[in-house]
Regions:
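Juxtamembrane transmembrane-helix boundary signature
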Residues: 22, 49-82, 91-97
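Membrane-interface "cap" regions at the ends of multi-pass membrane proteins
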Residues: 1-30, 86, 157, 193, ...
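Loop-to-transmembrane helix boundary motifs in multi-pass membrane proteins
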Residues: 86-88, 123-126, 292-294, 298, ...
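Extracellular/periplasmic helix-exit of transmembrane alpha-helices
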Residues: 57-70, 214-229, 252-280
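Flexible loop linkers connecting adjacent transmembrane helices
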Residues: 2, 34-39, 62-87, 139-146, ...
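Helix-loop-helix module between adjacent transmembrane segments
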Residues: 56-61, 86-106, 114-140, 199-200, ...
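Transmembrane alpha-helical segments of multi-pass small-molecule transport proteins
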Residues: 92-96, 117-139, 157-162, 327-343, ...
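Hydrophobic alpha-helical segments and their helix-loop junctions in multi-pass secondary transporters
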Residues: 156-182, 191-212, 373-381, 406-418
Length: 419
């Protein structure tokens, strides 16, 4: 490796990190439930759905990050600048509902993990998850963005090891994996499961947040003066290159985790009953592969809940600030957003049912995040020379159309009782 390559790499490393925080949204408890269900019911059939979803996510997250870097503003802030006050409030309300639904899934997932590991009652598990996430947010709130990112990356490593460990005990079938790369379905139910997988993968709050993360990270690493002079210094091209690398590696890891969960279920749980809940999947994994693998799986679920609920609260704060120009202390927001999840846990609602409801709410919110993102990144008056090319516009809108159509289909099937 030449000295020049070494210097470039040395300069590149400090710019990496935001995508790994956003990637946590792609390995939250909702993904665990969707991917385990897909593998247990249909074996390797829907591997292609996860592969396509991951490619879609890479494009969407890059556009969000590019929007933030080029404009210096987050997606919510840009929308807030272009909307009337009533429109801003209405948009904020739907975004907050989506944020609450996201938090619901993540807190419940973490509480379930504590219950599986230590027998902690679900309500108290939710309280513990909320308290730990608040501690993580204190780090971020004190301006220690790099430390916050390091903690989240550490949790992402635990998630990866926890969810993929079972594959060493029950290796998937290579021919099954190859067969799963061929796009096809097996009846209407498999379409519903595929829509659920896609809905659990592309998360609205990750789209909103990434455009803010890149600016917070740059200001923390390089200082506000460097961040503000990005255009005049020619720094932007290097930032965008670093962002593409950041997203590629972060979402490749997230995609590997999601596909690994499906492969684990296909190899060890196919045809077994009771695996359509996280508790049932844990029991089946422990029974089929041994209690150690079951414990490691639960540890991965715990890390997933802790990381994703912290990132979700961070996203909610940025959404409110961008749309309403109001910055409520993030710990106050964390307390308020925790209440719905604790009420549901305290009421004794079935956790998997709550996860399903939360995924439907997320499906409603996806078009409101993706369509404005595509429109803004295509406008030269917003993006200048970095506006999407015709090819990227076509690809972006095609991805948006597929995601929105599948999520609306999921909502329809769920509301009509067919899901």
């Amino acid at each position: 490796m030449s000295v020049t390559d070494s210097e470039h790499r040395h300069k590149l490393i400090p710019l990496l990190g935001p995508a790994f925080v956003a990637a946590v949204a792609y390995v939250d408890p909702g993904n665990v439930a969707a991917n385990i269900t897909a593998g247990a019911r249909y074996g390797y059939l829907l591997v292609w759905v996860l592969l396509a979803s991951n490619i879609f996510a890479m494009v969407i997250q890059y556009l969000s990050a590019k929007l933030g870097l080029v404009t210096g503003k987050s997606l919510p802030a840009l929308l807030g600048d272009r909307m009337s006050k009533p429109a801003r409030i209405a948009f904020w309300i739907q975004a907050e509902i989506v944020a609450a639904a996201t938090d619901l899934a993540e807190v419940i997932g973490g509480a379930l993990a504590l219950h599986l590991l230590f027998g902690v009652p679900l309500l108290w598990g939710g309280v513990i998850i909320g308290a730990v996430s608040m501690a993580l947010l204190v780090v971020q709130g004190e301006g220690k963005q790099r430390q916050f990112e390091t903690i989240i990356v550490g949790l992402l490593i635990i998630i990866t090891l926890g969810f993929l460990a079972g594959l060493f005990v029950a290796p998937p079938s290579p021919s099954g994996i190859l067969g799963g790369l061929l796009p096809r379905f097996q009846g209407t139910d498999s379409v519903l499961v595929a829509a659920s997988m896609l809905g659990a993968t592309v998360m609205p709050h990750a789209v909103y947040l990434h455009s803010s993360l890149v600016n917070d990270h740059e200001a923390d690493e390089l200082g506000p003066s460097t961040a503000d002079s990005r255009h005049s210094s020619g720094h932007l091209s290097r930032l965008l290159r670093a962002t593409r690398i950041d997203i590629y590696w972060a979402l490749s890891i997230a995609g590997l985790v999601n596909i690994g969960l499906l492969l684990l279920a296909a190899a060890a749980l196919a045809g077994q009953s009771g695996t359509d809940t996280i508790e049932g999947a844990h029991t089946a994994i422990s029974s089929a592969l041994g209690p150690l693998v079951g414990t490691v799986f639960a540890v991965g679920l715990l890390a997933s809940g802790l990381a994703s609920t912290s990132v979700g609260a961070y996203a909610g704060s940025e959404i409110m600030n961008g749309l309403l120009h109001v910055r409520v202390p993030i710990l106050v927001r964390r307390l308020v957003s925790l209440i719905p999840a604790l009420i549901i846990l305290g009421a004794g609602a079935e956790p998997t049912w709550a996860l399903v409801v939360s995924q439907v709410a997320l499906s409603f919110g996806i078009p409101f995040a993706i369509i404005p993102l595509m429109r803004l990144t295509a406008k030269r008056e917003v993006m200048g020379e970095y506006a999407n090319t015709r090819t990227l516009r076509a690809v972006g809108f095609a991805i948006a159309a597929v995601i929105v159509a599948l999520n609306l289909f999921l909502v329809y099937l769920t509301l009509t009782g067919q899901g």
